């Protein structure tokens, strides 16, 4: 069409494309589609998005939609955007309506940072500082899904070594945004915990919340009990009313006095609630160390290494590295998760952007008791 204009840049989501888009339009609103696969707008979808944008004055409007995966159309609802929603993989869908005036302001105020990968991320963070980002809870378009990986595979993109260059850019954009809104954590002001002020029955407790893990729980418990340390420790298993053979298996291991088998009195606990049940128990040690019921420690010295790190770093929380593997312990992609996203000078800020900090995690128990885990079964560890 005569009205069409082709913009050429280094990448669809790069900074130069965002700037080209901003400088090439004088209209009130810009509909931005972030994929190359076929898209079908619903009846009066564009008019509806514009109507809501005008009524709310939003910097950006996004909506629920339908996704076509393997020939099947499914509803794809998205969630509301909040002040703290700075994860770079926040799901807006592939279609967003941008406020033209605020888009042009981005180009006017754009500084020297030119991102190859984080251009769109930088733009939407900027827009969130200019006005609201509004979720329109209506199914307004249909897109063809081009990433058919399972969600369990996608969630590790941020730690895949092949994506390291991408992650560095995302961290830079996120850090600039946090500074702009006055939310940047000053890493020079860390308080150091006092490891000597309280008495504990043991130095460390390995905590294993479990529900119906009859195939893996024995290996996890034995792995924990096999640790070699120069301090006393125990293993606290919170059995959340398993209905398979998990409880029977745990009872068979009870001959080891270091195993503390807890069954909550109520049935309303998620994984986070089970964690609280363990850390508040009288048997919990000075350091509470996570081990999932389907995980194994990589060596018999892992627990010693974790506790040593607490004392060496004067830290309130420790996160180690881990390796993805199958039931036969064969390494699975992306392999070793080394948590390069955490750095001493900016890790606490970058943590707000990424999809969590994986196992093994460990906490100074008095601080964990003070904060408490949310009683959920998803994201409870990341929240802590």
Describe each PLM feature range:
Residues 9-25, 265-283:
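Glycine-rich, basic loop-to-helix element that forms the pyrophosphate-binding segment
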Residues 26-40, 285-296:
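Short beta-strand-to-loop acidic/aromatic patch adjacent to the donor-nucleotide binding site
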Residues 1-2, 38-39, 239-248, 267:
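A conserved acidic beta->alpha catalytic loop
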């Amino acid at each position: 069409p005569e009205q069409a204009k082709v913009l050429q840049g280094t990448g669809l989501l790069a900074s130069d494309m965002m700037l080209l888009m901003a400088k090439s339009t004088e209209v009130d609103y810009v509909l931005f589609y972030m994929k190359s696969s076929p898209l079908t707008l619903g009846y009066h979808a564009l008019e509806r998005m514009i109507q809501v944008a005008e009524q709310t004055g939003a910097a950006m409007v996004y909506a629920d939609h339908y996704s076509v995966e393997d020939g099947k159309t499914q509803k794809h609802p998205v969630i509301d955007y909040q002040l703290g929603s700075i994860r770079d993989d926040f799901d807006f869908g592939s279609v967003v309506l941008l406020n033209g005036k605020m888009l042009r302001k981005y180009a006017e105020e754009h500084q020297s940072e030119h991102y190859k990968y984080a251009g769109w991320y930088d733009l939407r963070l900027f827009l969130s500082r200019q006005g609201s980002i509004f979720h329109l809870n209506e199914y307004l378009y249909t897109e063809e899904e081009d990433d058919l990986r399972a969600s369990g595979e996608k969630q590790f993109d941020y730690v895949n070594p092949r994506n390291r260059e991408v992650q560095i850019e995302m961290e830079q954009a996120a850090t600039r945004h946090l500074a702009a809104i006055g939310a940047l954590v000053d890493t020079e002001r860390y308080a150091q915990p006092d490891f000597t002020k309280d008495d504990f029955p043991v130095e460390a407790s390995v905590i294993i919340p479990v529900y119906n893990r009859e195939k893996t729980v024995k290996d996890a418990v034995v792995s924990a009990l096999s640790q070699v340390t120069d301090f006393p420790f125990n293993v606290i298993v919170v059995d959340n009313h398993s209905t398979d053979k998990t409880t029977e298996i745990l009872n068979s291991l009870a001959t080891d006095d270091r195993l503390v088998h807890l069954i909550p009195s109520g049935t309303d606990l998620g994984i986070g609630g089970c964690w609280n049940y363990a850390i508040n128990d009288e048997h919990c040690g000075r350091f509470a160390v996570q081990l999932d019921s389907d995980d194994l420690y990589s060596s018999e010295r892992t627990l010693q290494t974790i506790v040593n790190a607490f004392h060496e770093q004067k830290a309130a929380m420790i996160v180690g590295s881990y390796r993805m593997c199958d039931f036969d312990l064969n390494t699975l992609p992306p392999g070793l998760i080394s948590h390069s996203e955490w750095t001493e000078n900016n890790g606490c800020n970058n943590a707000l952007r990424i999809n969590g900090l994986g196992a093994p995690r460990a906490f100074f128990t008095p601080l964990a008791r003070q904060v408490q885990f949310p009683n959920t079964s998803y994201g409870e560890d990341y929240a802590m």
